[in-house]
Structure formats: C-alpha cells, structure tokens
Amino acid sequence: MNRFVIADSTLCIGCHTCEAACSETHRQHGLQSMPRLRVMLNEKESAPQLCHHCEDAPCAVVCPVNAITRVDGAVQLNESLCVSCKLCGIACPFGAIEFSGSRPLDIPANANTPKAPPAPPAPARVSTLLDWVPGIRAIAVKCDLCSFDEQGPACVRMCPTKALHLVDNTDIARVSKRKRELTFNTDFGDLTLFQQAQSGEAK
C-alpha cells in the first residue's frame, strides 16, 4: 500500500491554504508552481482533491517515457522527463493530474503566437487536457508528497484545521482493525466479554 494524503471534509473550511503552501513550496524548489491539489466545494462541505498514489497507478502505466514511477511508497513524477503527451492526465481516474508550463526564456513575449491556429476541438471531458498554447511546454504536475522536504507534505503542515493527514500502511491497518471491531460489536454485541475470555485463555 502506498502512502497518500487523506482529507477530512468535516474539518476543511475551504480556505485554500493548502493550495498556497503547495504552490510556494514547489516554487522554492525550482518546480512548477501550480498546486498539486485542488479544493473542491459544494453546498455543504469542502475538501481538497489530490493524487491517491494508486497501487496500479494507471498514469505510470501509460507514460511513454517512464517519467512516473513508484518510489518509496509513493507515485512520483519527474518533471524533467515529461514530454507533454498528457496521457497521464487522461488515464487518471481521479482527475488529480494537472498541466502547467512556462514559456522558454529564449522565446520573446511578443512572439507571433497569437497568429497560430487555435487548438482543435475536443470532447468536453478532455478539452482542458488537450488545450495548448504555442511556445509553452505543458508539464504534468501531481502530488509528490513533498518528497524533497524532510518535514513532509506542506499542505499537511500548513492546514489550519488539521484536515489533512499523511497515511501509510500502519495507519490503514489500525483503522481497518477498528472498523472490524465496531462491526463485530454491532453484529454480536459488546466485545468486552470476548476479550476477557481470550485474556483468560492466554493466561
């Protein structure tokens, strides 16, 4: 099981502090400054959406240059290897991969890019992925758990309500055990007598 960041929508206040922290941290390390997570809002609650670091990682499967790999229990993307094909963004079932880029320094700002033909029409479902701007290289960006920072993900550290948590195998096993215990209590009654009996047998 990979590590990933999970959000508690009951604590999230939709302040976008996590997005700002993510953007600034990556910018300081020379990476694309686009936030690796996006706060989603509805009428009742809010919560950030970000990479789930899937076990099968469809984004890594479709990447033609192996820019996306599994490293230290997380799915990491090497921006320097990205060739802007956008297959990973199309393959991601959670829409957790965005594309960002900047104009190379040797291309003047007044280059004749406005005269270039517009991007060809695309289905609404993938239109944002297929949009392009002449002279700007689109780089895939996704949550990397701030692997370059010993303190861990900036979003987790900076969230004012502690709505974000980094979880790993141990955390998942503990929660799973607790859920099983609660289910047993619901179906078979109080566990206390059962646990006492088990303790007595052990003695």
UniProtKB/Swiss-Prot annotation:
- GO terms (BP aspect): anaerobic electron transport chain; anaerobic respiration; formate oxidation; glucose catabolic process
* Any one Pfam family match given in the protein's UniProt record, by short name: Fer4_11
The annotation note on the cofactor reads: Binds 4 [4Fe-4S] clusters.
Q: What's the subunit arrangement here?
A: FHL comprises of a formate dehydrogenase, unidentified electron carriers and a hydrogenase (isoenzyme 3). In this non-energy conserving pathway, molecular hydrogen and carbodioxide are released from formate.
**Which part of the chain is the 4Fe-4S ferredoxin-type domain?**
2-32, 42-72, 73-102, 137-169
Q: List, in alphabetical order, the Gene Ontology terms for molecular function in this entry.
A: 4 iron, 4 sulfur cluster binding; metal ion binding
Which cellular component terms (GO) are annotated to the entry? formate dehydrogenase complex
Q: Give the gene symbol.
A: hycB
Q: Where does [4Fe-4S] cluster 1 bind?
A: 12, 15, 18, 159
Essential cofactor(s)? [4Fe-4S] cluster
User: Which annotated residues bind [4Fe-4S] cluster 4?
Assistant: 63, 82, 85, 88
In Swiss-Prot or TrEMBL terms, this protein is called Formate hydrogenlyase subunit 2
Give the function comment from the record.
Probable electron transfer protein for hydrogenase 3.
State the UniProt keywords alphabetically: 4Fe-4S, Electron transport, Iron, Iron-sulfur, Metal-binding, Repeat, Transport
The scientific name of the source species is: Escherichia coli (strain K12)
